[in-house]
């Protein structure tokens, strides 16, 4: 069975990356700073992804394991045994995650194996924000080997996760509620060699153009829905998005965006 490692076990890591990898037949290792999340995933041995608006697309995600960053040897083995790696820790935590991975590689040694890490954050220059501190923290020998054999690319996140009501969150703390969006474009230019086939992952030649488009469309539309929904008293993004009065505002927003 193919294997993947995800640095981060938050909502996007579980509810988007984890789901796509599971549906593509991968065994998944999660690495997270939160011991409660790691313990919960190991205890439940999986979780359920709820797709808003279409429960027929829901899926269980099983065949997983999780570690905190303290499990350095286990993480090292999982990284070099994996067919693909992802990072989804939150943009402000990229440097810390990079330092943790560098510490592990410095401890056990970089291997001359082709690997690709895809950074999945709503963050400017996400791949560079991870690669720069990682490279700096590696020893000279490990830096040369790691740099030669490891590609660090980035993806545009088009799916968001929402917070369920208090009762559901308490009853199913491991589960994730996400938008019904199934596309993960990745910067092909930063990939070394090739990556395995993964459901909904698309390697793009002109990644920069798509990233700019996404900033103006997906991010803006979510902001409009969230802000107007808040003003009208909604607490769930999907409920706000389905309201005719908000849809009309969104249509006018798209008209302005398309003029850019």
Question: Which stretches of residues belong to each language-model region?
Answer:
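Substrate/ligand-engaging "lid" and interaction regions
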Residues: 1-7, 11-260
């Amino acid at each position: 069975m193919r294997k993947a490692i995800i640095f981060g076990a938050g909502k996007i890591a579980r509810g988007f990356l984890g789901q796509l990898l599971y549906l593509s037949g991968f065994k998944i290792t999660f690495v997270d700073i939160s011991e409660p999340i790691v313990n919960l995933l190991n205890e439940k041995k999986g979780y359920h992804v709820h797709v808003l608006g279409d429960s027929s697309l829901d899926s269980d995600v099983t065949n997983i394991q999780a570690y905190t960053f303290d499990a350095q040897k286990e993480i090292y083995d999982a990284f070099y045994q994996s067919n693909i790696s992802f990072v989804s820790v939150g943009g402000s935590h990229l440097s810390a995650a990079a330092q943790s991975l560098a510490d592990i590689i410095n401890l056990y040694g970089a291997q001359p194996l082709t690997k690709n890490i895809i950074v999945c954050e709503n963050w400017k220059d996400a791949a560079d924000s991870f690669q720069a501190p990682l490279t700096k923290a590696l020893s000279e020998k490990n830096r040369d080997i790691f740099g030669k054999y490891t590609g660090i690319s980035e993806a545009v996140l088009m799916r968001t996760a929402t917070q369920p009501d208090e009762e559901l969150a308490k009853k199913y703390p491991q589960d994730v509620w996400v938008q019904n969006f199934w596309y993960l474009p990745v910067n092909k230019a930063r990939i070394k060699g090739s990556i395995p086939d993964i459901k909904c992952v698309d390697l793009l030649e002109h990644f920069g153009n798509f990233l700019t488009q996404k900033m103006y469309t997906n991010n803006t539309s979510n902001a409009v829905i969230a802000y107007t929904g808040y003003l009208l008293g909604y607490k769930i993004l999907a409920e706000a998005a389905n309201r005719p009065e908000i849809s009309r505002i969104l249509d006018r927003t798209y008209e302005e965006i398309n003029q850019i």
